[in-house]
Amino acid sequence: MLKSTTRHVHIFAADIRNDNFIASDTKLTLDVDPDNEFIWNDPALQKVYSEFDRLVAAYTGLALTEYNLRRIGSDLENFIRGLLQQGEIAYNLDSRVLNFSMGRPQVRGPGQIENRPGQ
């Protein structure tokens, strides 16, 4: 089964049936932020899904290869970084992983985080 995994984006050339991955040449499955490193809201998550759909459509007609999946995953990772920098999502300080892989957050006060772009 072809797949691409980045820190916050897992893409599988597969369908999910009964909690199992079934390899597919025609379906991609997306798992966003599997470690719950971010605090998500529905609008931000829908933006990621829409961007994923747009990227997949841009590759229509091209071979389904690991390289192309990695390109889509990298583009989505950058898209998520943009959401973080714009303040549409925030780091989850209760996450089991406090990696701050997309830049250090700035703490403004008790329980409030401000993301610092490029840090």
From Swiss-Prot:
Q: What is this protein called?
A: NAD(P)H-quinone oxidoreductase subunit M
Oligomeric form and interacting partners: NDH-1 can be composed of about 15 different subunits; different subcomplexes with different compositions have been identified which probably have different functions.
Task: Name the GO cellular-component terms.
Answer: plasma membrane
Q: Which PANTHER family match?
A: NAD(P)H-QUINONE OXIDOREDUCTASE SUBUNIT M, CHLOROPLASTIC
Q: Which InterPro entries match?
A: NdhM
Which EC numbers characterise this protein's activity in its record? 7.1.1.-
Q: Which GO terms describe its molecular function?
A: oxidoreductase activity, acting on NAD(P)H, quinone or similar compound as acceptor; quinone binding
Q: Which enzyme class, named as a word?
A: translocase
In terms of one coarse class, where is the protein primarily found?
membrane
Record flagged with keyword NADP? yes
Q: List the disulfide bonds.
A: none
Q: Which gene encodes it?
A: ndhM
Kindly state which reaction or reactions the protein catalyses.
Answer: a plastoquinone + NADH + (n+1) H(+)(in) = a plastoquinol + NAD(+) + n H(+)(out); a plastoquinone + NADPH + (n+1) H(+)(in) = a plastoquinol + NADP(+) + n H(+)(out)
Query: Which HAMAP family did the record assign?
Result: NDH1_NDH1M
